[in-house]
Curated annotation (Swiss-Prot):
Transmembrane stretches, start-end: none
Role summary: Probably mediates the hydrolysis of some nucleoside diphosphate derivatives.
Annotated organism of origin: Shigella boydii serotype 4 (strain Sb227)
One MF term in the entry's GO annotations: coenzyme A diphosphatase activity
Lineage: Bacteria, Pseudomonadati, Pseudomonadota, Gammaproteobacteria, Enterobacterales
Protein name: Uncharacterized Nudix hydrolase NudL
Amino acid sequence: MEYRSLTLDDFLSRFQLLRPQINRETLNHRQAAVLIPIVRRPQPGLLLTQRSIHLRKHAGQVAFPGGAVDDTDASVIAAALREAEEEVAIPPSAVEVIGVLPPVDSVTGYQVTPVIGIIPPDLPYRASEDEVSAVFEMPLAQALHLGRYHPLDIYRRGDSHRVWLSWYEQYFVWGMTAGIIRELALQIGVKP
């Protein structure tokens, strides 16, 4: 697939035709969810945030809006939508959820479910000052280009863990966020 010519229709048809395989064990039982906001344009965008430097965990990192599932959430999808509204003012009613990717285990002990949603191009994003320092859009075709990600193997507590690294403009995209983007690319048939 030529990543430079990815249209929203291409993305949607590939995502819907190539369903994710969910078949692995997890050690993490605490649930979390992130919204993967795809901006509806002829050449779609991927909305990302940069977390506030004042946060205890993942300070300053590029991330998708999201967080822990709480008791008021009916599902992981509801949690992702609630967190997106809290962090960047995306109303849940503005998100067309098209599916989920297989959950990812975080190093902080959560099983994180990526929720894919299409959002309108004209939403007035408003970053929560407590949680988000920046909101930016990356062209989806660029984000899904696997050649932009570089592996780094980390050894922690006797285990090997691979993380992926990339830059977009002044933003360093790595860790779980980069891994989720790569999984989305593989899910729609982008070849490594």
